[in-house]
Every structure is written in structure tokens, then in C-alpha cells.
Amino acid sequence: MFGLINIGFGNVIAGDRIVAIVNPESAPLKRLKEDAKEEGKLIDATYGRKTRAILISDSNHIILSAIQPETIAQRFMQSFFEIEEQLDKIRRKG
């Protein structure tokens, strides 16, 4: 229950579909990025800037972002808390 999450430059993703947000510096993640590119499952949302985070979706799509993983994680948590607040309001009315 995360809704849409801003990953930079006006790009948003469906938060419920993301299974991991990782730092792109390790060799295995670089290979994962190359494999996704070959399979047509790479989504580059960096606008030509340095990749600072790799997001992995439940459909094995790899999304590149120029935003730090910590910042994206904070946005996930903020979205979660906002949805929880809305649900609390609905529960209190009902």
C-alpha cells in the first residue's frame, strides 16, 4: 500500500511493485543492469545523470534513478504514513 512514488524528474513508480532499492556500485548489480538492458527490461529515469539507485520491480524490471536510495526509501515511508492516516480517518467515520 504505497501508491505512486516520485523517483526524480517527474517520474513516478507504483510503490507496491518495488521489491528492492539498492546502491548500483557493486559488480553484481552492474551485471543485473546489463542483463535487464539486453532483455528490454531496463527503465532509465536518470535523464542522463549518474545512476544513484537501482529499483527492482516484482516483474524483474530494473529502474535507474538519479536519486539516492535513502531519499527514495524516505518517500516510500512518507507515502505509507499518508495512506495509513487516510485509512484511520475512514475507520473513525465508519
Swiss-Prot record:
It holds the Pfam family RemA-like. PANTHER family: REGULATORY PROTEIN SSL2874-RELATED, REGULATORY PROTEIN TM_1690-RELATED. Belongs to the RemA family. This is Putative regulatory protein THA_332. It comes from Thermosipho africanus (strain TCF52B). The lineage of its organism: Bacteria, Thermotogati, Thermotogota, Thermotogae, Thermotogales.
